[in-house]
Amino acid sequence: MVTRWLYSTNHKDIGTMYLIFGAFSGVLGTVFSLLIRMELAQPGNQILNGNHQLYNVIITAHAFLMIFFMLMPALMGGFGNWFLPILIGAPDMAFPRLNNISFWLLPPSLLLLVSSALVEVGAGTGWTVYPPLASIASHSGGSVDLAIFSLHLAGVSSILGAINFICTVFNMRAPGMSMLDLLFVWAVFITAWLLLLCLPVLAGGITMLLTDRNFNTSFFDPAGGGDPILYQHLFWFFGHPEVYILIIPGFGIISHVIATFSKKPIFGYLGMVYAMCSIGILGFIVWAHHMYVVGLDIDTRAYFTAATMIIAVPTGIKIFSWVATMWGGSIELRTPMLFAVGFLFLFTVGGLTGVVLANSGLDVAFHDTYYVVAHFHYVLSMGAVFALFSGFYYWIGKITGLQYPETLGQIHFWLMFLGVNITFFPMHFLGLAGMPRRIPDYPDCYAGWNAVASYGSYLSITAVLFFFYVVYKTLTSNEVCPRNPWETTPGVSPTLEWMLPSPPAFHTFEEIQV
């Protein structure tokens, strides 16, 4: 039994392990976020006794856990592995053993990340790991080095997974299936290209930081002719595509869910594909909008402002196409659809604040305030995460063969929806009022909205606990999931996974699909 999971080369088993790993890391990351909100519940030192370094270690750990160990493993590793081969009619991934090591690089990576927080003073650098704060002068112990090794392992894991997905889509499609068939497949395919192109840049940047810290190089040290701004360019050339890596698989899931529960095919299919490709390409040429305050030329800032705003165009195409799909559809508001509609609304809010932040003039005021925190939590904590839950409720019956309890799923949605909005909406006001990020204490004038935000986070925690109760009920109540639980209308042919039994056999498609 142990060897089945340890040595597994089966895409479904590996996908399941990714999902369990993502759930575990997500709980860990959620605990850190709760600590942050408890510290910020009132002015003054609350639970960390004025330990600013520890506060920043918690912030850093929260970010790394949620991004590299929750969202990416669950969306790409979990749903990507589970459903991409099934959707294209392939028996498995192109390189099943590569798939195995892609997963098994993650637990050691997580171990290194946790170790970095536990040795010396921890890595209190923020997830950006900027020097000179991350240099040996300011973080003298082994913490930052451990965090860098953790990132290296997670990066190798993602690159190998990306190569696997790309080869699978190119080479493993069933006869007669064109490249242009399903939006989730497109989403994973585009995301894989982004990973493949941007992770090596991160690897280079953090390796240079590693040698600066340990081998006396001075890539980022002005005393030796280096420049810390170079690190920012390298990091954000990875960091901006990274946020699209987190959201694009979510786009794919949302497209499938909205089409299924509106009982009609997606509106503007080809436009959706081109929009995702455009977002992927544009994501690589806007990185310096994270750096408006470092002293870029005026013309550079003008270019990055314009380029960043252009990303709103394909994103808008996607939003309106989803709305157009629902328009005139026979909408059924089951839990996956609730999360998808919630995604639409909240992702749009996050996108609007993104357009505000794209302006280099305005961003000088907003940079490093809670306005930025509000913006990226709207697109991540309510965009990517809602897409994740939507996909979970959509596919859990197919994965386990057991259907979730509908009422409990809907309760989970409303708890979550209220919780995250009460947490993050007030942060816009705090940011406009100038409250800085990454600081564990604040003047009394910010007390009101911080208290509200902290109460919101307690509600979100309740929602997370309730979600695990829903999972428990699903796995123990034995409500068998039929082949296709979402009785799709005759006019709309269901995608390939709904033609298989729930759960599918260990080896699907033993004969070629036509």
UniProtKB/Swiss-Prot annotation:
Its cofactor is heme; Cu cation. Heme a3 binds at residue 375. GO terms for biological process: electron transport coupled proton transport; mitochondrial electron transport, cytochrome c to oxygen. Mg(2+) binds at residues 367-368. Its EC number is 7.1.1.9. It is found in: Mitochondrion inner membrane. Pathway: Energy metabolism; oxidative phosphorylation. The chain crosses the membrane at residues 16-36, 57-77, 78-98, 101-121, 146-166, 182-202, 234-254, 266-286, 309-329, 337-357, 376-396, 413-433, 451-471. Component of the cytochrome c oxidase, the last enzyme in the mitochondrial electron transport chain which drives oxidative phosphorylation. The respiratory chain contains 3 multisubunit complexes succinate dehydrogenase (complex II, CII), ubiquinol-cytochrome c oxidoreductase (cytochrome b-c1 complex, complex III, CIII) and cytochrome c oxidase (complex IV, CIV), that cooperate to transfer electrons derived from NADH and succinate to molecular oxygen, creating an electrochemical gradient over the inner membrane that drives transmembrane transport and the ATP synthase. This is Cytochrome c oxidase subunit 1.
